[in-house]
Amino acid sequence: MKINSFLIILILLFISIKNSNGEPEKKFKLITLLAAHVQDLGFNNMVNRGHVEVSKAMKLEDSQAIVVVGYNDTIRILAPLVAVGDVDLVICSSQDHAQACRELATKYKGSSIKTQFLVRGSGEATSNLITYSYNYANANYISGYFAGLYTKTNKIGFLSPGAIDNNNDSFVYAFWYGAKRANPDISFYYYNIGNYLNPDKTVAATKDLLDMGCDMVADTLNDFSTGNTLIANNRKTAMGTSGFPQRDVYGEDVIYSYNYNWFKLFYPVAQSVYSGNTNNTNWYADFNLNETISFFGLSFSFTVPNETLTKFYEELDYLKRTPRLSHPYFCNDLMYEYAKKNHLTMSTNDSTHCLANSQFTRINAPFPGMTWLGNYEITLTEVYQSRPIQIAISSISSFFIVTVLVMMGLVVRFRKNPSIRSASPIFLNFILFGALIIYVGIIIWSSSINSASCNAQFWLVTLGFTTLIGSLVVKNVRIWLIFDNPELKLVKITNLQLVPWVGVCLVINIILMSILTSVGDLREVNAQGIDSLGKYEFMRICKMNSSGASTLYTILAYFAALLLIGVFVSWKIRIVDILEFNESKAIANTLYAISFCLFVIVPLMISPQDKQSEKIILCIAGLFIVTAAVLIIFVPKFYRVYIFGSGGTSDMFYKKKKQSPVATARAESTSKGSSGGGAGSGGATGGSGVKTNKRGNLVSGDFSDDTESSLSEPNKPVKVVAGAVLAEFTDDTISDLDNIDQPIEIITENGQDSNNNNNNEENKDNNIENNKISEEIKENLKNEENNDGDN
């Protein structure tokens, strides 16, 4: 007994030593290529499940499932892995991988690389190439048969990728023929999606089919988007036709589903490769009477009537017992005429009305009774800008348009009033007309977009700003040239001389805008992916190319140059003490308003902005800039007209106020240098009818809209007190001295003749003469203020 036990122990020990010292267990590396991620709950999920089950059954430590899409991706990823030489089997599950895998198999055939490729499709097998296929037509036929039995509305819908992967719509036909065979009264509608995996189109197309009254909708796609849409719409007729056991996930919401069992195909192939077999064959998967090797699994809801199940299984048993090439979708009364019409080849025995096996996947055109709805395209939804904001901007702009028109009328009505005449009515109306154009442009900018409005808004706004700013600048250049004239040279500047300069500004603008329009390709486009739009939403926007953008920047630089000129002119005329002409403060305030807007707008525009927000900011900024400019320039003028009446006098510009230190110092200097009141007492004190400026100098003049000239009487000498500004503004010219031919006698502020200094008697005479001149100025002012001008 002890001997027997000892012998058994020795035998077991010997076996253990033999196994431990023997050849190590053969390693096996498996790679499976997927066309999409496993989350699709469809074809790729089931392929991955087959890969995992094979790895578990064979206890593989080195197996990978890799997602690759298309030929290039397959070559790029797979070729380096195969070149290492340690990959035993590559499963190319999709037809997307087929060409690349076949090329690699051909490349390494007969080489030291022992990798074998299991490729989906047909063709001759080689020592390192195994092909496989499965009866997809059979699965679709029997699914259609169930749909025909179960439908209540007799309307069935279907979705397919369409004419891709050389499949065309042959499987749609198989589904339809199964439904037609079960229920001849059905109506059948189908869309092509264009891809095996496009959930957005699938959902939208399914909804369309439901709206048409279809209660059964199936597909040949890789996911369950169709079924999910039916479930979301409270339909209890979802069908799982993607090869995934959908009922395992959705339960009774799915009425019927079939699933692939890839393990039953992959495992025997992997075992064959593992054993070293190179005598490869083609593999084919289908329903089988032997359930242990049947590729398809079926599942039904408990709500399916027994009568329906009975008819279904009767048809399925018929398919299992009938050779595949004699199945109803190959052989029927419709096939002969269809093949003849579409140039397909029938089988050798035409009397059977069976299509040749190689011709089945060429079926694409619909059979009589199939309604093809075309290639489905999702209808994009247009997103409009906020209607209330659009109405608000348009209403405000319209109000200011009316206001500007009223102002233009008032300028014409009160053109003789010194408050208006001194600012040149023609240029005031130019400024208002520019504002009017901008307001119209803002209305177009805020309205619906088309190619015409895209161009119109840029033209109107740029021309408006050029007219407004150009007129303001040119008008004040005249004041600068007149008063920046220390030598009292003759200066003649008429409106006819100034208006062309505004025209020059406009011509430059027109040239730049013409370039933008011609080369900028400024047009309306339907933009997607902006302003947090949905995937299938769009917004109309104006778009230009890079050349147009460069031109637009040039236009902006041009506007900046005009503004800088305006700043310069404003600074230069600040010294003009005649308030009728000194608009430097108004111009400065206008420029401050524009600058304020720029400081606010530029950071906002640089930061990421929605197109709608950008449009609103630009429109509001335009309204603010133009309105501020108009109010700053015109409100003081109309206010003076209102206070002093429609006639008005030049006195409206002068207010009693404390003299500036400079003016006080000059007045004191004048008093000390004169003997008794002279020019100092008569001029600096601003006696009755005589006005003084900030410097204490005499000011006299009549102001019209377009000319400036000195006071003089024909054929008489003109005596001018040094430091006094003498100007009469008529309709013809603007000059410091009209009668240049007459002798000019200059009298200094000290009352001394420039040709005879230090003569006290002459000083007294000059002071008396200075007072006489002041009286003449006073009388002339009264006469001119009562004299209506034409402009």
Swiss-Prot record:
It is a multi-pass membrane protein. It is found in: Membrane. Residues 1-22 form the signal peptide. Residues 412-424, 475-495, 572-585, 637-791 are cytoplasmic. Residues 761-785 have a biased composition (Basic and acidic residues). It comes from the Eukaryota. Residues 749-760 have a biased composition (Low complexity). Its main location: membrane. Residues 674-689 have a biased composition (Gly residues). The keyword Signal applies. GO terms for biological process: biological process involved in interaction with symbiont; detection of cell density; G protein-coupled receptor signaling pathway; negative regulation of asexual reproduction; polyphosphate-mediated signaling; response to bacterium. Glycans are attached at N72, N168, N279, N290, N306, N349, N545. Residues 752-781 form a coiled coil. The keyword Transferase does not apply. Residues 23-390, 446-453, 517-550, 607-615 are extracellular. GO terms for cellular component: G protein-coupled receptor complex; plasma membrane. Keywords: Coiled coil, G-protein coupled receptor, Glycoprotein, Membrane, Receptor, Signal, Transducer, Transmembrane, Transmembrane helix. GO terms for molecular function: G protein-coupled receptor activity; G protein-coupled receptor binding. The chain crosses the membrane at residues 391-411, 425-445, 454-474, 496-516, 551-571, 586-606, 616-636. Residues 664-715, 746-791 are annotated as: Disordered. Pfam families: 7tm_3 (PF00003), Bmp (PF02608). In the N-terminal section; belongs to the BMP lipoprotein family. In the C-terminal section; belongs to the G-protein coupled receptor 3 family. GABA-B receptor subfamily. This is Metabotropic glutamate receptor-like protein D.
